[in-house]
Amino acid sequence: MRKYFAAVLLLLVSASLVLSIQKSGEWIKYTSPEGRYSVSLPAQPKLTMQEATAADGQKFPQYLASVIEPGDVAFTIGYFDSVPGTIFSAQAARDGIVKRINGTLISESAISLSGYPGREFKILMKPARARPADATYVVRARLYEADKRVYLLQFIFPQSLESDALAAKAVKYFDSFQLGELSPM
């Protein structure tokens, strides 16, 4: 009887471990009604807002949804509405990002989403507070402008973790991004 009980207990524990492993790999579909987008993420994002300043000094809000996984793997979606009287430049935005993070642009290409123009780029960066001090991070990003709203998706990870599995995770994330109710420009 003890052997039977032990076998059943082992089977139940094994089954629960398998189920918990499967659930930890499931992604959620996050929808932002205010941001007018949806995206798949590995967990519910943390939402924040910060004030930014345009080149002409005008202040405007930027909204951010982010998920950080163990190992410093981060998924971020930011958006803001273009400041009235300004013209958005994807190239200037890219250059500003590279400069702000003291990074090196590795690659870039033109992309589009639902007819809206965009840029995809990859940057290598060494954060000021990186541990160890020689840690290098990879920033894969997609930038879109749609109906005077700018979206920036980023997938950030330590370069030491670069792998096919992580690349597949980035593709899953980026390819899941969808715009809500917008009309083509």
Regions found by a protein language model. Name each.
Residues 24-34, 52:
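Short acidic/polar N-terminal linker immediately downstream of export determinants
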